[in-house]
């Protein structure tokens, strides 16, 4: 009976979240269509009115026109990325929840932290429906069981208590089931994920990241991180999720996908891991083999 009551409450929250996402998706799609029309119109106008012949004045005019188009194209690309995130959120807005009470606020109700692939937030009211799995507070889900916890926020270390850890199975915007656990919360989901891993492509492990893996993924203290392990121990998965984390953290430092490269043993391996970052809502990164790298860096006389 208690489960049915909780299930009904969770369905209400899921509906509220999906309704908000759907509303924003419609608005973003309309805005994106407008941006596309503006980019096309600006390009047409440039080719019809701007002269690319010699002369300083013409060069300045052409440069200004190109800068304007690049700015419009960047806005269009950003809108398109937001649409991709919203579509993804509409399918599975979140996969976990932790109830957290910060020290000093024990008399207040615990804050329900829903965790998903990307943040879902009302920019007007600042209500956060879902926290990105890479946010500092989301580390509570990966690193702790119920009880005393702490996480490192931009303002410093935040301490408190987790009173509930919950995981969800949500597909196509429908809640199939959830379960709570005080001990080894991710074992059930991990076993299920592994049982469905009969695929020719590597999958993301964002729902089943272990404590030690999370510490590697979020490490910002070391410039170089070496991870050792036997074959099949998850080294590549951790590396790709670390890439997603670094791109999320590196927005302020302008760290983008084209700043990162994977050195793969062969092209087949590069194809095998190609789906992970898009699953996480990030742009894919370049993958080179050692042979290609040496061919590009070294002289043509070198034979491998």
Q: Predicted regions span which residues?
A:
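Extended, charged low-complexity regulatory segments
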Residues: 1-206, 210, 214-218
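Pre-Walker A (Motif I) flank of P-loop NTPase domains
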Residues: 221-225
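Conserved lysine of the Walker
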Residues: 235-236
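Post-Walker A alpha-helix
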Residues: 239-240
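Alpha-helical nucleic-acid-binding subdomain
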Residues: 247-304
């Amino acid at each position: 009976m208690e489960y049915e009551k909780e299930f009904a409450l969770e369905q209400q929250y899921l509906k509220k979240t999906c309704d908000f996402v759907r509303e924003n998706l419609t608005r973003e799609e309309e805005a994106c269509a407008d941006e596309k029309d503006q980019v096309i119109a600006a390009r047409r106008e440039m080719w019809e009115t701007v002269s690319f012949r010699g002369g300083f004045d013409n060069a300045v005019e052409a440069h200004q026109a190109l800068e304007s188009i690049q700015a419009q194209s960047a806005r269009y690309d950003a809108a398109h990325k937001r649409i991709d995130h919203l579509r993804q959120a509409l399918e599975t807005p979140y996969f976990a929840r932790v109830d957290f009470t910060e020290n000093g606020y024990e008399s207040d109700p615990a804050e329900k932290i829903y965790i998903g692939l990307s943040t879902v937030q009302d920019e007007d009211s600042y209500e956060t429906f879902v926290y990105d799995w890479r946010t500092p507070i989301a580390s509570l889900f990966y690193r702790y069981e119920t009880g005393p916890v702490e996480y490192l926020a931009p303002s410093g270390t935040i301490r408190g208590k987790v009173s509930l850890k919950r995981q969800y199975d949500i597909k196509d915007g429908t809640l199939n089931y959830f379960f709570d656990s005080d001990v080894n919360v991710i074992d059930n989901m991990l076993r299920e994920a592994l049982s469905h891993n009969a695929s020719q492509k590597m999958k993301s492990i964002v729902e089943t990241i272990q404590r030690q893996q999370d510490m590697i993924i979020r490490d910002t203290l070391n410039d170089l991180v070496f991870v050792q392990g036997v074959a099949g121990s998850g080294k590549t998965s951790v590396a790709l999720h670390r890439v997603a984390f670094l791109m999320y953290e590196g927005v302020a430092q302008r760290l983008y996908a084209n700043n990162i490269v994977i050195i793969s043993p062969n092209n087949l391996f590069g194809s095998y891991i190609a789906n992970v970052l898009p699953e996480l809502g990030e742009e894919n990164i370049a993958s080179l083999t050692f042979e290609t790298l040496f061919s590009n860096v070294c002289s043509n006389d070198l034979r491998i």
